[in-house]
Amino acid sequence: MGKRVLIVDDAAFMRMMLKDIITKAGYEVAGEATNGREAVEKYKELKPDIVTMDITMPEMNGIDAIKEIMKIDPNAKIIVCSAMGQQAMVIEAIKAGAKDFIVKPFQPSRVVEALNKVSK
């Protein structure tokens, strides 16, 4: 049984692409969320091993969602996948508790590398 991943992104095609990469890498998709608030709810409900988190989303952004998830589980393994690759945003995500930061558009191998790194 592979590790379970919660995919969080407001773009359906991005969730689909991540789902494909994640399952091909031998991980299981525990669920999907389309915004930060939903991500926090799904995290509580599904208790995934890993979360992929977008930053720019409606209702609650990824940084706030990371902070909320870290309150629930200080050991949460969150990988940020965002087009916002500015240094300040990366630092803010890591400070909030993210374990890795992947800049979109990304290569599937980069996602697999991040999954393998955080699941150790």
Curated annotation (Swiss-Prot):
Cross-referenced Pfam families: Response_reg (PF00072)
Binding-site positions, Mg(2+): D9, D10, D54, T56
Organism: Thermotoga maritima (strain ATCC 43589 / DSM 3109 / JCM 10099 / NBRC 100826 / MSB8)
Coiled coil: none
PROSITE patterns: RESPONSE_REGULATORY (PS50110)
Record key words, sorted: Chemotaxis, Cytoplasm, Flagellar rotation, Magnesium, Metal-binding, Phosphoprotein, Two-component regulatory system
Domain of life of the organism encoding this protein: Bacteria
PTM note: Phosphorylated by CheA.
Main function: Involved in the transmission of sensory signals from the chemoreceptors to the flagellar motors. CheY seems to regulate the clockwise (CW) rotation.
Domain Response regulatory: 4-119
Cofactor: Mg(2+)
Name of the coding gene: cheY
GO terms for cellular component: cytoplasm
Annotated GO MF terms: metal ion binding
Highest classification ranks of the organism: Bacteria, Thermotogati, Thermotogota, Thermotogae, Thermotogales
Location(s) in or outside the cell: Cytoplasm
Biological-process GO terms, alphabetical: archaeal or bacterial-type flagellum-dependent cell motility; chemotaxis; phosphorelay signal transduction system
Residues where 4-aspartylphosphate is found: D54
Record text on cofactor binding: Binds 1 Mg(2+) ion per subunit.
Major subcellular site: cytoplasm
Keyword Mitochondrion: no
Protein name: Chemotaxis protein CheY
